[in-house]
């Protein structure tokens, strides 16, 4: 009998009851639902590139890109088009089907919108899906990016409404929900999830998933991040989250949002192969591939390739053979060359 339910009226106590299930029961329920919708041995692969790094005015306590914290991160200007395209070609050659571009902004400036739209069009011309995360979007900005062909827009809710004020004060929870509304209204697909391990309680993890699952339409992609503690940020000395609580979060996300891609996102660098295998069984079916997520370490491509082989997993769209090849096209986003080179885009030159 099918356990799949697509609902938008989940109550907090229902979700907390799922979290409280014995692990075997929870995993069985989540995996059964997962198999009803998806091939359980296929994983969607995305590559994430920081197109503008650091100097963000926001005060997210987990983020090394905030200008408010001394994390040793050097700010970078918006990347030049050819640099972005070289990275996109490398991602495609390595088996990624989606290329995600992130900028450390509160929101994009109007002067940069034509360039961002061109970036979307150029990457799409390579035959890849496109995603951006640029901060808050107005209705007009969302429509502009949609008109350029942007497939996905990422804007995370981060945590529950109740715990949110302990994480960030420079934008409201409603600001985030408004951006998701603008993205969905534009026709783009929504990518939205959160971060666990930020000192929140179990009820906050339930609250985050409740907010996502009770949106008028579930996010198409739900990234679940494990906090990566960065020296210099207010959250650098928080206690580690029990890894099994992370697995539970993945499983409950799969149950609540059965048609969504659930992405095993930041924090994989610190996860054992066994923990990742449990997450895939619990319903995770998307990852970021490559050694860095914006400014955060990620497993090497060869490590992911080996894990996929051992687990019998394969990338979506049959790019398995290309995972054999080492990506030798360009140094990764952290190894940017001289800031004065043509690697960076100059908005003033438009």
UniProtKB/Swiss-Prot annotation:
Cofactor binding notes: Binds 1 [4Fe-4S] cluster. The cluster is coordinated with 3 cysteines and an exchangeable S-adenosyl-L-methionine. Binds 1 [2Fe-2S] cluster. The cluster is coordinated with 3 cysteines and 1 arginine.
Binding site for [2Fe-2S] cluster: 100, 131, 191, 263
Gene3D superfamilies per record: Aldolase class I
GO biological process: biotin biosynthetic process
Domain (Radical SAM core) ranges: 41-268
Catalytic activity, as annotated: (4R,5S)-dethiobiotin + (sulfur carrier)-SH + 2 reduced [2Fe-2S]-[ferredoxin] + 2 S-adenosyl-L-methionine = (sulfur carrier)-H + biotin + 2 5'-deoxyadenosine + 2 L-methionine + 2 oxidized [2Fe-2S]-[ferredoxin]
Keywords for this protein: 2Fe-2S, 4Fe-4S, Biotin biosynthesis, Iron, Iron-sulfur, Metal-binding, S-adenosyl-L-methionine, Transferase
SMART domains (alphabetical): BATS, Elp3
EC code(s) of this entry: 2.8.1.6
GO terms assigned for molecular function: 2 iron, 2 sulfur cluster binding; 4 iron, 4 sulfur cluster binding; biotin synthase activity; iron ion binding
The UniProt record lists the keyword Membrane: no
Cofactor entry: [4Fe-4S] cluster; [2Fe-2S] cluster
Cross-referenced InterPro entries: Aldolase_TIM (IPR013785), BATS_dom (IPR010722), Biotin_synth/BioAB (IPR002684), Biotin_synthase (IPR024177), Elp3/MiaA/NifB-like_rSAM (IPR006638), rSAM (IPR007197)
Residues annotated to bind [4Fe-4S] cluster: 56, 60, 63
Pathway, per record: Cofactor biosynthesis; biotin biosynthesis; biotin from 7,8-diaminononanoate: step 2/2
Top-tier EC class: transferase
Function: Catalyzes the conversion of dethiobiotin (DTB) to biotin by the insertion of a sulfur atom into dethiobiotin via a radical-based mechanism.
Family, similarity comment: Belongs to the radical SAM superfamily. Biotin synthase family.
Subunit annotation: Homodimer.
Classification via NCBIfam families: bioB
Designated name of the protein: Biotin synthase
């Amino acid at each position: 009998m099918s356990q799949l339910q697509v609902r938008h009226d989940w109550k907090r106590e229902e979700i907390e009851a799922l979290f409280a299930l014995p692990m075997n029961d929870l995993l069985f329920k989540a995996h059964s639902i997962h198999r009803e919708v998806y091939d359980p041995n296929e994983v969607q692969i995305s590559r994430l590139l920081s197109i503008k790094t650091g100097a963000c005015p926001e005060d997210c306590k987990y983020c090394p890109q905030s200008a408010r914290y001394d994390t040793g991160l050097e700010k970078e200007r918006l990347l030049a088009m050819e640099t972005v395209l070289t990275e996109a070609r490398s991602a495609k050659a390595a088996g990624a089907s989606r290329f995600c571009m992130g900028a450390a902004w509160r929101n994009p400036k109007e002067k940069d919108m034509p360039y961002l739209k061109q970036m979307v069009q150029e990457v799409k011309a390579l035959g890849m899906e496109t995603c951006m995360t640029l901060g808050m979007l107005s209705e007009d900005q969302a429509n502009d990016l949609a008109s350029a062909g942007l497939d996905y827009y990422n804007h995370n809710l981060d945590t529950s409404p109740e715990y949110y004020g302990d994480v960030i004060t420079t934008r409201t929870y409603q600001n985030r929900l408004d951006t998701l509304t603008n993205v969905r209204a534009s026709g783009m697909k929504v990518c939205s999830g959160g971060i666990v391990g930020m000192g929140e309680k179990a009820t906050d993890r339930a609250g985050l998933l409740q907010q996502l699952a009770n949106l008028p339409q579930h996010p198409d992609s739900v990234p679940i991040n494990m906090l990566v503690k960065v020296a210099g940020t207010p959250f650098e000395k928080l206690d580690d989250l029990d890894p099994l609580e992370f697995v539970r979060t993945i499983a409950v996300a799969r149950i609540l949002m059965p048609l969504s891609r659930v992405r095993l996102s930041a924090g994989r660098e610190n996860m054992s192969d066994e923990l990742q295998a449990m997450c895939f069984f619990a319903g995770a079916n998307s990852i970021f591939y490559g050694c860095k997520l914006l400014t955060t370490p990620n497993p090497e491509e060869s490590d992911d390739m080996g894990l996929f082989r051992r687990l019998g997993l394969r990338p979506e769209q049959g790019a398995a053979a290309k995972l054999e090849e080492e990506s030798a096209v360009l140094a990764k986003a952290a190894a940017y060359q001289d800031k004065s080179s043509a690697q960076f885009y100059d908005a003033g030159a438009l």
